[in-house]
Amino acid sequence: PRDFDLHTIDLETVACIIVESHTYAKKLKPYTEEFWRNLDMIRIVYDIPIIVDDIFMGGGKLGKFFGWETTSFRPSIFTMGKAITGGYYPLSITCYDDYIDKALGDNFNWDHGYTYSFYQPGIISMLYYLEQLNFDKFDTIQRVVREIFEGHGFEIQANAGLIFSTKREKPFHLIAPLNATGEYYNVLNRTLTNLKESDI
């Protein structure tokens, strides 16, 4: 990944553009609405598919199962992994819009043979994870985790949904679980209480 000036790139030679739904590398700073509007304009004017990498931010960490749904943008193609089973099983998905579907045609063969076949434990782990998601409690989890960190003298430097970047003496990062309960909060509280200043 790199920053670049659009004026130095010949967009006629670009096959696709890949972005994350929310950047981790830039300290969880969200992309602006203007950024997403410009991407959409580039897609329309230059016929460039926009691929959203939702591997890290998907799975509910931002408050929606699909991380890109927290933006105003709809990708041409998006991919997810890891988080779709809560990290319990290596499973990934890739989906695409009607425009890509039309370009592939009716007879496009998705058969990967033995290189990729659906495996029952992977599907079961994803279904179980989906059952655990409770977005009704999302705001509460976010608020309580924030309060626990601040109560232990941590500064919340940034947060994207349930992903927190904090600092006391040193940076400390945490992804809160989507099914956090009182037990989780107690463990987090005890963990932060037991940390020495030299540890953080």
What is the role of each PLM region?
Residues P1-I200:
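Conserved N-terminal phosphate-binding loop of PLP-dependent enzymes in the Aspartate aminotransferase
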